[in-house]
């Protein structure tokens, strides 16, 4: 029977060869919601050390939408921020990462766009690190597949997106330690055999978005 897809755009790619096996509106520019964070994580891993300690700003904490439960003035490692970014889809974590690497989210977005060009992601434009809606923030299903194929070559990226759960540690301004448990929002990790996970996303404008990778008998 013909494939019934409700998604506006979809692509199935062989990760080894990069060959597109199936495409529905694969080159159509669409909003991407939190799948943006695939690029945020990639830029973070390529331009910082996992053991870097980040002091969380009030700006990061005040970011709307899904949260990694950061607190202003708390100190947290870049590694823990990356898990909060991908498992809890923390918009606050995205801003904290951006400010650590580039001082402002605008400068970080330019970093994201430069990385996109360098990796052959040519029909995508980033305005922010978390995917909150902006008419000038868009991608294509094909670009997300290419980006994820590239990012999964990074072992730390692969380790983070395939984790079901992670406990982060924050040093609070008063000297106390606060642990936060992150649970991966991607249900396919449990429900689909061989799923590596990658990133879910949702905004009212973008609808439900998903980028996922699967390994079956060594093929991805």
Report residues per predicted region.
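Penicillin-recognizing serine hydrolase domain
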Residues: 1-5, 104-220
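Beta-lactamase-like hydrolase cores
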Residues: 1-35, 50-52, 109
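Solvent-exposed, polar/charged alpha-helical surfaces in well-ordered, non-transmembrane soluble domains
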Residues: 19, 38, 42, 46, ...
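Short active-site loop at a secondary-structure junction
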Residues: 22-43, 53-54, 76-84
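Second-shell loop/turn segments in exported
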Residues: 24-31, 65-72, 80-84, 94-103, ...
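Short, well-structured active-site flanking segments
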Residues: 46-59, 156-163
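Acidic helix-start/capping segments at beta-turn-to-alpha-helix junctions
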Residues: 55-67, 134, 167-170
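Conserved catalytic neighborhood of penicillin-recognizing serine enzymes
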Residues: 64-95, 179-197
């Amino acid at each position: 029977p013909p494939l019934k897809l409700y998604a506006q755009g979809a692509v199935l790619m062989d990760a080894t060869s990069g060959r597109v096996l199936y495409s529905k509106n694969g080159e159509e520019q669409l909003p991407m919601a939190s799948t943006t964070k695939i690029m945020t994580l990639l830029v973070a891993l390529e331009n910082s050390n996992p053991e870097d300690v980040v002091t969380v700003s009030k700006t990061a904490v005040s970011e709307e939408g899904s949260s990694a439960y950061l607190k202003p003035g708390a100190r947290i490692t870049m590694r823990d921020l990356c898990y909060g970014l991908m498992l809890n889809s923390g918009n606050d974590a995205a801003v904290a990462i951006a400010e650590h690497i580039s001082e402002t989210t605008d400068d970080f977005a330019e970093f994201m766009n430069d990385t996109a060009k360098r990796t052959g992601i040519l029909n995508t434009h980033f305005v922010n690190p978390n995917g909150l809606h902006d008419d000038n923030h868009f991608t294509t299903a094909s670009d997300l597949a290419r980006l994820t194929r590239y990012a999964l070559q990074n072992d730390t990226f692969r380790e983070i997106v395939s984790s079901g759960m992670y406990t982060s540690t924050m040093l609070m301004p008063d000297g106390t330690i606060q642990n936060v448990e992150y649970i991966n929002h991607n249900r396919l990790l449990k429900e689909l055999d061989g799923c590596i996970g990658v990133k879910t996303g949702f905004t009212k404008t973008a609808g439900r978005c998903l980028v996922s990778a699967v390994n079956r008998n060594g093929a991805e």
